[in-house]
Amino acid sequence: MVANSPSDGAVDLYVLMDDGTIATTEIKNAVLAACNDDTVRPLTDKVSVKDPQKVSYNITFTYYVPKDSSLSSTEIKAAVDKAVAEFVAWQCGKLGRDINPSVLTGKLMQTGIKRVALTSPVFTTLRDGSDDTTPQVASVGTITATNGGYEDE
């Protein structure tokens, strides 16, 4: 959660769930009820619970497998899919976390592939709300992973 004060007497709360999703209305109402209680907030403050701004990104890459790999193409694909899922979960797990393709490349290279040609995402700075602006959260769009085949070392 991020709290900021865009103007005097106003407090905006931005809630992100543990899995990186935007909070449901039920959760936002519970947060508002807890933070808007007269015993918790200053009398003149107006508390609001708002959604962070989603910044959509796509993942597109081609990966290449070493010809002498001991892993089958099915095993490599499963490892690549798992690495992408881990990246997506990490990427949306915190408000203001920059979209960082280097992290994706690192995760992919640990799967046993030889190399990856990453087309998207590109590095994108996201706002964390610390400057009293609406915080942003990354939201994955399409994922296109292409096996480019085998290559010699």
Briefly describe each language-model feature range.
Residues 1-97:
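Carbohydrate-recognition loop of C-type lectin domains
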Residues 77-153:
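An aromatic-glycine-centered, glycine-rich loop/turn in mixed alpha/beta architecture
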